[in-house]
Amino acid sequence: MRTPLAAGLAALALLAAGCGGTGAEGGTAGGGTFTYALPADPGVLDPAMGVLNVTNTTLSLAYDTLVGIDAQGEIVPALAERWTVEPDKVTFTLRKDATCSDGAPVTPSDVAASVNHITDPDTKSPIYGVLIPTGMKAEADDAAGTVTLSMPKPFSFILETGRAIFVVCGKGVEDRSILARSTSGSGAYRLTEAVPGDHYTFKVRREYAWGAPGTSIKDAPETVVLKIVPNEQTAANLLVSGALNGITLYGPDRTRVEAAPGVTKTITPVANGQFFYHQGEDRPTHDPAVRKALTQAVDLKELAGIASSGTGKPPTGLVLHPRPCQGDTVTGHVPAHDPAAAAAALDAAGWKPGPDGVRVKDGKRLTLRYLYATTRGAGVQAAAEYLATAWGAIGAEVKLNGAIDTKLSESLNTTQDWDVVWLPIGVTLPSQLVGFLSGPAAPKGANFAHLSNKQYQSLVDEASQVPAAEGCDKWLQAESALFEAADMVPVVETTVLEAAKGATYEMVAGMFVTTSIRLTQGAE
């Protein structure tokens, strides 16, 4: 089975988030209630169907993964206490003390069932083929206390895949229908009340002792409430007033929250903003000379400030922090800003100015249909207008097309009625991008921009044959090859503000480090 493009793109754009959290001011106090704002309802709570970041934030309270990741990008134990890795498989030895929220032990068979349910074509899981690689199988040995994940051929990040699997245990293994509105996991908290559109309440499991190394649930809050607050201004007001303990802010309310007394904060990278050129044979951007000229026409530093409303950072790669492969794949690999050189390059490519200033070649105008999501905020809208002006200055005719997410996915997957698209991406492993940046083109495949970069594919093929650490140089070079060919243009690393009042907590890749949640002294 191949993941449908629309679902896969949703996963790329919405699933991942970076590391973040807030430091404590003063001591901490056990018990009490920690209240955190979610910007939307998490929807169906079955881990196999969780594609939204808010869903996975919610699930992270109640479920564990096989392994975790620390702030430096290193894999650390979770349900698995140790592992052995081969090019095409990894065998995990599970802890013996982990139990499910209903008291049942967590077994290798539970892990295997979680994986094989995701990979079952009948499940139609949107994370299969993106977070869980196509072809993965799981086999349990309950007597030995091990579970083996295998692939039909070598796969670099087979160990790292273990951090993407929320393990269902206990009653949820036998009856997955209960997972739509309840939880059945081994996490530090269990769901006790779900009021869709309003709040989700979790109670601590004091017996929890199998979290990240060196952590404890002893002083954790008795209750965690995730409150649905769609409006950021409202969420900011609630935090400042003390009605909330934690929020994540994307927009202009960040400034006043940062300045509010008693608020601790962390700036966290959560996604990359970039645009892609459609390389179909009938498109002007099929020609690499045109793509590079259009890129040269843009002051990317200025565009980054516009798109992020001044809160972004320079991009250094496609994978979110903490990265399994450390390095800057962007600097020195993107065509530099030079409008005069851009105009000259278009002249050389045969695109000559017409009577109205729009360039023409073989009777065809240099028209670019620019597609972007209207749900990404005012900065992305302003960025679209900036690009239209910059490209208009060198003789391109730009038609802006703002669309909601579902329409954008339809355009990418089916109608292909675009020439340039602004598409945020958030992935935790470089392998999660391969199907979207190479291979069969849409609508038959997931390669929505019709990319055909032989250097990228060759480097990916080499990197995929060896474990992640050995292949990192090749993975990094593969990203740079995309930028050098102007297949896609990285613009900005988008950030959010993680803010807390009366509490402290940590998040990694959009998921709670549950044993880090604490109420500070004096909190209610």
Task: Pin down the residues of each PLM region.
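Ligand/substrate-recognition segments at binding pockets and active sites
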Residues: 352-427
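Detector for C-terminal structural segments
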Residues: 28-29, 195-198, 298-329, 378-388, ...
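Surface-exposed binding/hinge segments that line
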Residues: 84, 89, 127-172, 193-195
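N-terminal lobe/hinge region of extracytoplasmic solute-binding protein
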Residues: 37-87, 116, 184
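Gly/Pro-rich hinge or "lid" segments in bacterial periplasmic/extracellular proteins
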Residues: 162-219, 223, 339, 344
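Aromatic- and charge-enriched surface segment that lines or borders ligand/interaction sites
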Residues: 81-124, 145-148, 284-286
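Ligand-site clamp/hinge motif
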Residues: 208-257, 385, 397
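Structural transition elements
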Residues: 314-355, 375-381
